[in-house]
Amino acid sequence: AEIVEIDTTENDFVLTPEMLEKAILEQGNQLKAVILNYPANPTGVTYSREQMAALADVLKKYDVFVVCDEVYSELTYTEQPHVSIAEFLPEQTIVINGLSKSHAMTGWRLGFTFAPAAFTAQLIKSHQYLVTAANTMAQFAGVEALTVGKDDAEPMKREYIERRDYIIEKMTELGFKIIKPDGAFYIFAKIPADYN
């Protein structure tokens, strides 16, 4: 496979339907898959329901498969909750997620996917050769996180918003250009040219 990058820098790191369609057509409609991660690492960019639906329309039109990293889905800071592209393209999407960010379980190596059955069968083949299994303690903790602790991300979100706003204020005072992240926990700042 050949990687095709779509530069979103000039659009505040937001992929638009026009950018996506242009990339597909430049590849002679041979583009097979798109990898999306949102909230994005490292920019914190998120997408509205309308933006996601518009991207899905293009992907459906050209029958492009989607691999979507949604590990920060519980850490969005806008009024609108996270919207998965799988809502619009359930038969064309593999969603990758986990508990490392939403439940502060980094290092536990506990993740999961949502995918159509045909893809899942293929994923299992790869998985069984790459990973033995999550340890028993992590599996029990994961069940607890997804049931009893399903709202555990809320206090973290409030804390991250406070930290984000503080860092943005201070870095802006120092002359950094920052696009306010609507998710994840990163600040992707442009370093001023005269900064030493």
Predicted regions and their residues:
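PLP-dependent class I/II
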Residues: 1-196
